[in-house]
Amino acid sequence: MRIARFVVDADPLYGVVEEQKVHTLAGDPFFQGIKPTGQSHELEDVRLVAPIIPRSKVVAFGRTYRKHAEELGNEVPPEPIMFLKPNTSVVGHNEPVTLPSFSDEVSFEGELAVVIGRICKDVPVEKVPEVIFGYTAANDLTARDAQRSDLQWARAKGFDGSCPLGPWIETELDNPDDIGIVTRVNGEVKQDGSTSELIWSVHELVARASEAFTLLPGDVILTGTPAGVGEVREGDRVEVDVEEIGSLGNIFRR
């Protein structure tokens, strides 16, 4: 099932996407379940927004793909690197991203994101499927120059618009550990990888995040990016295509 968040006239609504229609839901599916209102819209007549604005946090992992660590000249860490992105970093499909004034070197990072569905802490790996609401595509934008110069990654990873998510949440994947991720810049393929290349499985990463933090409904976990990252420039359109989910696209401006 695909759960979208969209705007028709005013406030954002949730809906179930089926083919070229979106069927409106009553309230918030994270807390009130899937309750159709009976109203539907053509998908082309609505504006998709970020499928979730995390109420609490985005937990992100770095250097979870060996080849990506190597392309940046980094060693593979014994434990995955964990950091946070604020909810103000989240934007949706087709929303423009303003490049930060403090950086001249912003990179794209196409990723699979996990959306949490219930309050949880210290979740064993085998229990992780019980706390997952679904999955979406993500672009973990990174100001590389700030990442190198700053002692912490807060500015480099957390600037406004640095976490595009979308286009919707897919509640079921056949196998989260075998999902293709393709990132294109202006139509040219830059990343072509798979979660099968992850050093730690998707469920292991969720379990590790729950060891560090209490996870809340709507929290998002970014699982890391495969090799092929590169810079994005003003006017570029970056598309992250995640198998079984769809394509997340954003245009960049100054």
Where are these regions (language model features)?
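A generic local secondary-structure boundary/capping motif
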Residues: 48-50, 71-73, 97-106, 120-127, ...
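Ligand-binding beta-strand-loop-alpha-helix segment within the catalytic cores
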Residues: 110-112
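Short Gly/aromatic-enriched secondary-structure transition segments
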Residues: 73-79, 125-136
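Catalytic-pocket segment enriched in acidic/His residues
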Residues: 51, 68, 76, 144-254
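Structural signature of FAD isoalloxazine-binding scaffolds in flavoprotein oxidoreductases
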Residues: 76-93, 108, 239-244
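Short helix/loop capping segments that flank catalytic or ligand/cofactor-binding pockets
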Residues: 69, 93, 123-125, 145-146
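N-terminal non-catalytic cap/leader segment that marks the start of a structured domain
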Residues: 1-80, 172, 176, 182-184, ...
